[in-house]
Each structure stands twice: as structure tokens, then as C-alpha cells.
């Protein structure tokens, strides 16, 4: 008697899982696709991408270094060879 319940129990679980899976994927896949399609729109509208050039214009407290916010207006532009991209290109490997 236990053998009968064991064999039908395993097949019963497999059968119920297959039966449920036949109804569930269309609903789940629809939800996932909708979520994935809306992700770039939410990401792009709420946040802007931060670029290296905009990071150079961030205010710096006096204890961390010189204030470079108005350097373009004063005519004291930074040496272009000190730019991060230039340093990375000239770095010996």
C-alpha cells in the first residue's frame, strides 16, 4: 500500500507541476517582458549618466584640494597631459 502511494505521489507531484506550468509561463513571461521593457525608460528618465568631464567640475572642500570650479573663466585650464585618458594611454605596460 505504501508503494502505491509513493509511486502515485511522485507522479502526482510531477503531473501537478506540469499542469500548473502549462498555465503559469504565459503569465510570468508576460510580466517579465513588461518589466524588462520598462526598465530602460525608468533608468533613463530618473537618472543621468555621469561623465568624467562633469566630475571635474564638482565642488571640492578646501581641505581636499584646490577649488577648480571657475578655472575655465580664469584662464587657468589644466594641463591636458594630466587628463586621465591621456595618462592611461601613455602608461607603460
From Swiss-Prot:
GO terms, biological process: cell morphogenesis; dendrite development; immune response; regulation of cell shape
Pfam family of the protein (one): LST1
Membrane topology: Single-pass membrane protein
Coiled-coil features, chain-numbered ranges: none
Segments traversing the membrane: 14-32
Highest taxon of source: Eukaryota
Recorded GO CC terms: Golgi membrane; membrane
Compositional bias segments (type: Basic and acidic residues): 66-82
Localization: Membrane; Golgi apparatus membrane; Endomembrane system
Region (Disordered): 57-82
Modified residues annotated as Phosphoserine in this record: 54
Keywords: Cell shape, Golgi apparatus, Immunity, Membrane, Phosphoprotein, Transmembrane, Transmembrane helix
UniProt record similarity statement: Belongs to the LST1 family.
Chain's role: Possible role in modulating immune responses. Has an inhibitory effect on lymphocyte proliferation. Induces morphological changes including production of filopodia and microspikes when overexpressed in a variety of cell types and may be involved in dendritic cell maturation.
Protein name according to UniProt: Leukocyte-specific transcript 1 protein
Gene designation: LST1
Amino acid at each position: 500500500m505504501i508503494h502505491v502511494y509513493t509511486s502515485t505521489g511522485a507522479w502526482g507531484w510531477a503531473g501537478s507541476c506540469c499542469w500548473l506550468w502549462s498555465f503559469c509561463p504565459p503569465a510570468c513571461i508576460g510580466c517579465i517582458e513588461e518589466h524588462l521593457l520598462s526598465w530602460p525608460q525608468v533608468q533613463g528618465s530618473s537618472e543621468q549618466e555621469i561623465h568624467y568631464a562633469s566630475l571635474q567640475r564638482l565642488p571640492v572642500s578646501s581641505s581636499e584640494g584646490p577649488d577648480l570650479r571657475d578655472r575655465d573663466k580664469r584662464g587657468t585650464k589644466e594641463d591636458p597631459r594630466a587628463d586621465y585618458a591621456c595618462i592611461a594611454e601613455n602608461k607603460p605596460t
